[in-house]
């Protein structure tokens, strides 16, 4: 008997699939469609086991749906713009384009041996001019639809790299790459009006029934709807033009406990004072050395600067509150100004304590008397409290009721109005980087800011750039910026900012429906293929990418690039767990960890016998040397082993730990399946009484594997295949029944281990390719059990069980029960007083 050789067979079947065009997506109105998509990768140059798990999940779904009769779209592309390519050019020389396309070629070569059912004819990279040119066309359409605008905004500026940094790229007040102290600078930036859709994006989350609840909650919190009061304090002794201070608060019920007002360092009043007061300027400069993110402000020490200005309480003109510039107030939320009620906000409490400000409780826990507070009393809004300075009298009510009463009272007195606000800000997309999609805008001295003419698209990035000095190479290119105004024909200047790379990934799913179209989408193809039926990716993309994609689909619908049904582009979302691995380390003389590769450790020791510390189930990390190279696994065991293991060990939403022993066990099982198929293919036994039992086991396997795959319980589907393998190997059924069952096994395991499935299918005489075979259907009659297992109780205690035909007469059941050894021991030779058979449920024996 020959041996199963994955290295020889896997490439052969991949060639057969390619030759037959098995995975080419076909627009077939006569068939239902199914669009499965995994979040496309950044071309870093190497795939990792997380990629293997992610793409195998999508592949299992795609293959099963194709077998079930769907016309399947399962594409692949590359999220290819971004800073890493520029950083590589700075550090190693060369060009970002060469680095990127080289990495794409490497990763494609690593992915293809996995045998994924991808339609590679639809492949594109977001750095392809053909792709970003269509993105530029949509940008122009969005400008014309009023979805794009330009304004001054405060940003994190790295003075060494000379670029804007995202909040996440500011670490301890310094640029993540340069290490230089970051400053806040005001720059003119381009924005998408995502905030116009805040309410719609929030409400529509309730329609996404096939999204994880955690993701929907994360998005809801990010959008951050709040109901509050917007009103104005009148100011005493204010500079000209600043006689009112507009404030937004979500807790107007605490207005009678106010002790100060505070404004953002970027508030117009703070800007005015900064220009006229050196002390204010110094304080504001200090504030701007902290990042602009809420997290950065939360971690920073809370500081304030007393401006000397005062505002009057709206219900008592004699009650004046000091106005501080505070480093924890965000300009882009609400109005950039707040009032502080220290008794009911811990941040305000610490601020008031630091600066000696009064602390006045507005409400107390039920049954408590007013006393000095050691900390802020901040109950849930749903909790009932006793208001002592409320707007609805001294009574007990919830915070929610108190807020509603405060808004109603203030509105009745002409003090402000109730408003709904959102935490979601407009999306700033300007980046002072080369390796991104150029913003297709022209600056003309006569016409102002105008979009590039569409016939001139794409606005291509110039190749002749250098990265030998910091900053954006487009700014210093000798000719690229120079252009002609498309409106008046005069000399003009091209926009040198490029788009945030999240723009690239916010519509790629739509481009896959017609990747070679001369417009961003093709209406007929988009109408057929959209929406994405199953989207798969990491939960780390729960907010930005997924929220931006939801916005972009709406923008594309408004500008005529997507049908109305596609404003929620992803029908179902699955967020998979990570692939983890043990970390192996020793320590140097100073106690610092020294990490070791898995292949250098045997039985917990290095080659020289030094024992290692083992940290279990850690995220794979190059620096900690616990990364498993999928190519090594494929060379050692074959792609099917890697696919089988990452699907089998745990539910797909949870992390799975990669172990060498687990991979070896998976490989052994697949070799066992091959040997079983080889044995059955040569069997010649006659049909017999066991054929029926095997047919029933096959039907159950079909039902349970189908349920597991369709329900994303891949580990349960694989567990059933293990069980079915055992059943088949033990079965004494005739040769034809076993061959029939083995062919079904090939079909059921084809989504997970497609190469081995083709081997088995061919061995057992299957017609054509199993990848093109219809998904098996279980005979409903074979799923009905014709036996039933009845527990036996003697005087109320369980003594055993008996399996009998469902239709067996009660008198016959009684005979079998009385013949049972456990019952006979309990009776001790005596006759029972009663023997009661409850059909289909239980047998009770009374002694």
Swiss-Prot record:
GO terms for cellular component: cytosol. GO terms for molecular function: aminoacyl-tRNA deacylase activity; ATP binding; leucine-tRNA ligase activity. GO terms for biological process: leucyl-tRNA aminoacylation. PANTHER family: LEUCINE--TRNA LIGASE, MITOCHONDRIAL, LEUCYL-TRNA SYNTHETASE. The keyword Protein biosynthesis applies. Belongs to the class-I aminoacyl-tRNA synthetase family. Keywords: Aminoacyl-tRNA synthetase, ATP-binding, Cytoplasm, Ligase, Nucleotide-binding, Protein biosynthesis. It is found in: Cytoplasm. It catalyses: tRNA(Leu) + L-leucine + ATP = L-leucyl-tRNA(Leu) + AMP + diphosphate. Its EC number is 6.1.1.4. Its main location: cytoplasm. This is Leucine--tRNA ligase. ATP binds at residue 622. A motif ('HIGH' region) lies at residues 41-51. A motif ('KMSKS' region) lies at residues 619-623.
């Amino acid at each position: 008997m020959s041996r199963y050789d994955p290295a020889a067979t896997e490439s052969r079947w991949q060639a057969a699939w390619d030759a037959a065009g098995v995975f080419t997506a076909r627009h077939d109105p006569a068939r239902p469609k199914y669009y499965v998509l995994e979040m496309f990768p950044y071309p870093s140059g190497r795939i990792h086991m997380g990629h293997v798990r992610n793409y195998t999940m999508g592949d299992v779904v795609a293959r099963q749906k194709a077998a079930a009769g769907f016309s399947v779209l399962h594409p692949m592309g590359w999220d290819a713009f971004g800073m890493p390519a520029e950083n590589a050019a700075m550090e190693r020389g060369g060009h970002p384009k060469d680095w990127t396309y080289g990495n794409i070629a490497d990763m494609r070569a690593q992915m293809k041996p996995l045998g994924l059912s991808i339609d590679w004819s639809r492949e594109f990279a977001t750095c392809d001019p053909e792709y970003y040119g269509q993105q530029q066309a949509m940008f122009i359409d969005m400008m014309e639809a009023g979805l794009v605008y330009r304004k001054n905004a405060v940003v994190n500026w790295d003075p060494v790299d000379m670029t804007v940094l995202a909040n996440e790229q500011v670490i301890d007040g310094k640029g993540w790459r340069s290490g230089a102290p970051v400053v806040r600078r005001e720059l003119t930036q381009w924005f998408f009006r995502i905030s116009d859709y805040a309410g719609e994006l929030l409400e529509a989350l309730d329609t996404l029934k096939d999204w994880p609840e955690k993701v929907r909650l994360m998005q809801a919190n990010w959008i951050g709807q709040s109901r509050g009061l917007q009103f104005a304090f009148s100011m005493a002794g204010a500079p000209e033009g600043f006689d009112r201070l507009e404030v937004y608060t979500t807790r107007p019920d605490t207005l009678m406990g106010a002790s100060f007002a505070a404004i953002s360092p970027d508030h117009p009043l703070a800007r005015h004072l900064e220009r006229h007061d050196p002390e204010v300027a110094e304080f504001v400069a200090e504030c701007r050395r902290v990042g602009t993110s809420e997290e950065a402000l939360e971690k920073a020490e809370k500081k304030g600067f007393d401006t000397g200005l005062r505002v009057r309480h709206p219900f008592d003109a004699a009650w004046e509150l000091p106005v501080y510039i505070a480093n924890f107030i965000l300009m882009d939320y609400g109005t950039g100004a707040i009032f502080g009620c220290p008794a009911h906000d811990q941040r305000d409490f610490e601020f008031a304590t630091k600066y000696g400000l009064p602390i006045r409780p507005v409400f107390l826990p039920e049954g408590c008397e007013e006393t000095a507070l050691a900390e802020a009393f901040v109950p849930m809004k749903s909790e009932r409290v006793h208001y002592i300075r409320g707007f609805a009298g001294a009574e007990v009510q919830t915070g929610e009721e108190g807020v509603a009463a405060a808004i109603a009272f203030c509105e009745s007195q002409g003090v402000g109005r109730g408003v709904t606000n959102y935490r979601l800000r407009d999306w700033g997309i300007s980046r002072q980087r080369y390796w991104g999609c150029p913003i297709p805008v022209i600056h003309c001295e006569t016409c102002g800011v105008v979009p590039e003419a569409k016939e001139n698209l794409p606005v291509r990035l110039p190749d002749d750039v250098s990265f030998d000095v910091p900053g954006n190479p487009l700014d210093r290119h000798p000719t690229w910026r120079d252009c002609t105004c498309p409106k008046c024909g005069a000399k003009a200047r091209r926009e040198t900012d490029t788009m945030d790379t999240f723009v690239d990934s916010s519509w790629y799913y739509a481009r896959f429906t017609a990747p070679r179209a001369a417009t961003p989408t093709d209406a007929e193809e988009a109408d057929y293929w959209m929406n994405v039926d199953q989207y798969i990716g990491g939960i780390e993309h729960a907010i930005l990418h997924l929220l931006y994609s939801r916005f972009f689909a709406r923008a594309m619908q408004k500008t005529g690039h997507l049908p109305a049904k596609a404003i929620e582009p992803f029908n179902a979302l699955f967020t998979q767990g990570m692939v983890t691995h043990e970390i192996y380390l020793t320590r140097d003389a100073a106690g610092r960890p020294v990490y070791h590769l898995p292949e250098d450790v045997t039985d917990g020791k290095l080659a020289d016998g030094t024992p290692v510390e083992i940290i279990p189930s850690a995220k794979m990390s190059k620096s900690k040397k616990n990364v498993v190279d999928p190519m090594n696994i494929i060379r050692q065991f074959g792609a099917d082993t890697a696919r089988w293991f990452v699907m089998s060990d745990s539910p797909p939403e949870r992390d799975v730990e990669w172990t060498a022993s687990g991979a070896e066990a998976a490989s052994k099982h697949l070799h066992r399946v091959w040997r079983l198929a080889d044995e059955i293919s040569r069997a010649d036994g006659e049909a017999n009484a066991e054929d029926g039992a095997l047919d029933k086991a096959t039907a159950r396997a079909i039902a349970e594997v189908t349920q597991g795959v369709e329900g994303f319980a891949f580990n349960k589907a694989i567990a059933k295949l293990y069980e079915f393998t055992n059943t088949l190997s033990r079965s004494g059924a005739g040769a034809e029944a076993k061959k029939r069952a083995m062919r079904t096994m090939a079909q059921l395991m084809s989504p997970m281990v497609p190469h081995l499935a083709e081997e088995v299918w061919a061995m057992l005489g299957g017609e054509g390719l199993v990848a093109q075979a219809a998904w098996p259907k279980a005979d409903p009659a074979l799923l009905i059990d014709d036996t039933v297992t009845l527990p036996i109780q003697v005087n109320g205690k369980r003594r055993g069980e008996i399996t009998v035909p469902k239709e067996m007469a009660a008198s016959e059941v009684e005979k079998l029960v009385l013949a049972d050894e456990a019952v006979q021991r309990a009776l001790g030779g005596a006759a029972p007083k009663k023997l009661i058979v409850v059909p289909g449920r239980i047998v009770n024996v009374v002694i």
